[in-house]
Structures are given as structure tokens and as C-alpha cells.
Amino acid sequence: MKKNTLFPLLFLTVFVFGMLSFTSNKKVIAVVFNKEMTRQDLMSLQKNLKDKNIILVFNKMKFTKNRLSYIDFSIDFGDGFSGTSKSEISKSKEIGFIRDYNDNAEQPFIVGDLKW
């Protein structure tokens, strides 16, 4: 069981922190919440964003067997882009947010359902 959850968690961690590392170049920040995330993962994400002056607030979270099953959150990038979303977390949904800092971005900010 541990082997099955370690890879998705490792991938998510690398994906999230990899995306966060682009903020110094002002490119793209993308976060997708998934059923493998724990409270500790979410608190770590919140801290990393705060270190970059991005405020992520968890209004409500539910966990099933210590894994994320519901999230109600707000995000504020401090540059006029902010939003909220709440949803059950499932494999068929991609809930989260994307902030694209590129000048020619087709959609500079998305929050909520990322499958479009």
C-alpha cells in the first residue's frame, strides 16, 4: 500500500515545488489538489506559497483515512488575482489553481475545476 501512494505523492511534491520555483522568473504556478494529499502536505504547500507572498487559506478540509476528500479554499496572489473554490476531491476532477505570469497568457488565472 505504501508503495502505491508514495509515487503519486512524490510526483505531486516535485510538480508543485517545481512550479513554485518558477516564481522568481514569474512564469507559472499550478497546484492540483488530489486524494493522496494529507493535512501535512497542505500545510507545507500553504507555507511555501506564503514565503512567496501568496496567501492560501483553507476554509474547510475533510479527510478520509488521512487523505484529502473535500476542500474549500481561497487563494490571493496579491496582484489583483484571487479566487475561491470548494469541491469534493475525486480522481475524475482536477481542483486547484493556476497563475500564469506570462504577458501573452491566454488565461492568466484559473481557480476551481481545471479540466476545461
Where do the protein language model's features map onto the residues?
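Amphipathic, non-transmembrane alpha-helical stretches in extra-cytosolic proteins
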Residues: S24-W116
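Bacterial Sec-dependent N-terminal signal peptides
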Residues: M1-K26
